[in-house]
Amino acid sequence: MQLSALIEKTVVGMGYELVNFEQAARGLVRVYIDFTPEDADKGSITVEDCEKVTHQLLHVLTVENANYERLEVSSPGLDRPLKKLSDYVRFAGAEALVKLRLPMPNAANRKSFQGILQEPVGETLALEFEGNEGPAKLEFTLADVDKAHLVPQVNFRSRKA
């Protein structure tokens, strides 16, 4: 079985979502996990979640005699990448940065846009952003996207007790 399929099967089987998987130089394998959309109310991935997945993957990769040197498992972070259509559904209403493969002629030949993700309609994705002449809406498909990720929302104000 291919390494990516093996990792995805294991992570999904444990009740998590595989956000991303990377094979880096010198045998480093990076795995990014998150809760499934159904379990999103559980909050953020913890160190304990990463530890649990790491232990399971180490056993599976050893049994399958996978070729790797090191394994890193972590959360996708505040700037979570958006890779699948389900990511755009899940994070509709959130602020995101979207970089397209080609410039959009109807948007001043820009490739990068930052704005609020809209609920996808079929295969069509949308982003509301602030254009040169006020609010604008960009429609695109997943195939048009080079990279996309959430814009981190950090609140440094202290909580009142």
From Swiss-Prot:
Pfam family, one: RimP_N
Sorted UniProt keywords: Cytoplasm, Ribosome biogenesis
Subcellular location field: Cytoplasm
GO BP field: ribosomal small subunit assembly; translation
Cellular component aspect of the GO annotation: cytosol
Main localisation: cytoplasm
Keyword Cytoplasm: yes
Role according to the record: Required for maturation of 30S ribosomal subunits.
Protein name: Ribosome maturation factor RimP
